[in-house]
């Protein structure tokens, strides 16, 4: 269930999941422990975990792809033999490096998917990709009606979402841009990345896990 409210005194729209702003700089919370970023920045299990700005941004970009698509189109799952090839070798016998186990194999052009969902220095405002494919296929008109209502809030200036960058600038024109995108061909962007989510949605619907009736 999506919950949102408009805080009048700060002119800020608070949302749970539906609208997010994604940028290339990792959230500051990773400064306490950047290990997840550094782990995902590698291409093989035997690569050392090096802490630098480039590795943090690379790891963050891949985490964004995971959270947006669950199984991105540019990601392959290697064989078990490849996964454990470097495990438990010297220098890798520790939890931080996950003992050299690395079950991911990224295509060389994996970064191409980021163009549509990540801003370089300014958060890219969008409907959360995972919800776009798992929740909103059957409730597109409900989503549009909600955005039309939000657009009427006077003096709206900021957005705080439960995920990714916050607060970010968010005004009537940003809301209208989302509406226009939903009503355009761009709404079905990145078909290769969305393939897993689309198939998952169909399966959940067939099993009755996703109810046929839309609750508003």
Regions found by a protein language model. Give the residues of each.
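Core dinuclear metal-dependent hydrolase active-site scaffold
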Residues: 1-14, 18-29, 35, 67-69
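Cap/insert and terminal regions of metallo-dependent hydrolase folds
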Residues: 27-216
């Amino acid at each position: 269930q999506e919950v949102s409210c408009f805080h009048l005194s700060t002119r800020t729209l608070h949302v749970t999941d539906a609208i997010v702003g994604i940028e290339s700089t990792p959230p500051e919370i990773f400064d306490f422990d950047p290990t997840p970023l550094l782990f995902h920045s590698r291409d093989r299990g035997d690569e050392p975990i090096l802490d630098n700005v480039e590795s943090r941004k690379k790891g963050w970009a891949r985490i964004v792809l995971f959270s947006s698509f669950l199984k991105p189109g540019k990601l392959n799952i290697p064989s078990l033999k490849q996964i454990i090839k470097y495990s438990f070798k010297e220098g890798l016998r520790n939890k931080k490096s996950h003992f050299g186990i690395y079950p991911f194999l990224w295509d060389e052009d994996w970064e191409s998917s980021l163009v549509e969902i990540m801003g370089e220095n300014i958060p890219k405002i969008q409907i959360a990709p995972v919800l776009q494919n798992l929740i909103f296929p059957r409730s597109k008109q409900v989503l549009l009606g909600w955005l039309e209502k939000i657009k009427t809030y006077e003096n709206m200036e900021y957005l705080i979402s439960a995920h990714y960058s916050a607060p970010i600038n968010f005004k009537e024109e940003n809301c209208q841009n989302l509406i226009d995108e939903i009503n355009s061909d761009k709404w079905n962007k990145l078909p290769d990345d969305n393939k897993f989510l689309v198939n998952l949605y169909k399966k959940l619907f067939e099993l009755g896990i996703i109810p046929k009736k839309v609750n508003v």
